[in-house]
């Protein structure tokens, strides 16, 4: 069985509103591997009226972003592509990550796929950037789940 490593930094992380999608075996299989951060800084911004976290594909700008690496099967990868509206909304690209903890491997560099934005509103680059995302964070911008959105 072919597996893929995927880095999640927003609503799919443990404790966040969409994490249940990774746990739902109807979507495929996902196994938590470890915590990591981007090797390079990237802008992690919260945008749109739904307060969605976006990793903007602008390496060298912003901050090193922390998140989680999951090993997913092909079915889950296809689900995540659908869920993230890839390639129209997010684009799945490769990213270099630094392992933060786990089995004495801190500091090791790993490559994984990430859902990031290549095309975005120019003013998003002026938004505050974050090292880590939490819907209940100090930013005060609570994520609006799809089922609670009035216009989607």
From Swiss-Prot:
<feature type="binding site">
    <location>
        <begin position="9"/>
        <end position="12"/>
    </location>
    <ligand>
        <name>substrate</name>
    </ligand>
</feature>
<comment type="function">
    <text>May contribute to degradation of proteins cross-linked by transglutaminases by degrading the cross-link between a lysine and a glutamic acid residue. Catalyzes the formation of 5-oxo-L-proline from L-gamma-glutamyl-L-epsilon-lysine.</text>
</comment>
<dbReference type="InterPro" id="IPR009288">
    <property type="entry name" value="AIG2-like_dom"/>
</dbReference>
<keyword id="KW-0456">Lyase</keyword>
<dbReference type="InterPro" id="IPR039126">
    <property type="entry name" value="GGACT"/>
</dbReference>
<dbReference type="Pfam" id="PF06094">
    <property type="entry name" value="GGACT"/>
</dbReference>
<dbReference type="GO" id="GO:0042219">
    <property type="term" value="P:modified amino acid catabolic process"/>
</dbReference>
<dbReference type="GO" id="GO:0005829">
    <property type="term" value="C:cytosol"/>
</dbReference>
<dbReference type="InterPro" id="IPR013024">
    <property type="entry name" value="GGCT-like"/>
</dbReference>
<dbReference type="GO" id="GO:0061929">
    <property type="term" value="F:gamma-glutamylaminecyclotransferase activity"/>
</dbReference>
<dbReference type="InterPro" id="IPR036568">
    <property type="entry name" value="GGCT-like_sf"/>
</dbReference>
<comment type="similarity">
    <text>Belongs to the gamma-glutamylcyclotransferase family.</text>
</comment>
<feature type="active site" description="Proton acceptor">
    <location>
        <position position="84"/>
    </location>
</feature>
<protein>
    <recommendedName>
        <fullName>Gamma-glutamylaminecyclotransferase C</fullName>
        <ecNumber>4.3.2.8</ecNumber>
    </recommendedName>
</protein>
């Amino acid at each position: 069985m072919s597996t893929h490593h995927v880095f999640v930094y927003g609503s799919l992380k443990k404790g966040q509103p969409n994490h249940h999608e990774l746990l739902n075996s109807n979507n495929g299989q996902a196994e938590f591997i470890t915590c990591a951060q981007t090797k390079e800084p990237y802008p992690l911004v919260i945008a749109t009226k739904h307060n969605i976290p976006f990793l903007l594909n602008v390496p060298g700008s912003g901050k090193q972003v922390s998140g989680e690496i999951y090993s997913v099967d092909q079915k889950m990868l296809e689900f995540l592509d659908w869920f993230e509206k890839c390639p129209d909304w997010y684009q799945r690209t490769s990213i270099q990550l630094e392992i933060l903890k786990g089995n004495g491997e801190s500091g090791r560099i790993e490559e994984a796929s990430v859902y990031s934005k290549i095309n975005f509103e120019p003013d998003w680059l002026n938004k505050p950037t974050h090292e880590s995302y939490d819907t209940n964070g100090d930013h005060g911008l609570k994520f609006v789940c799809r089922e609670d959105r009035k216009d989607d």
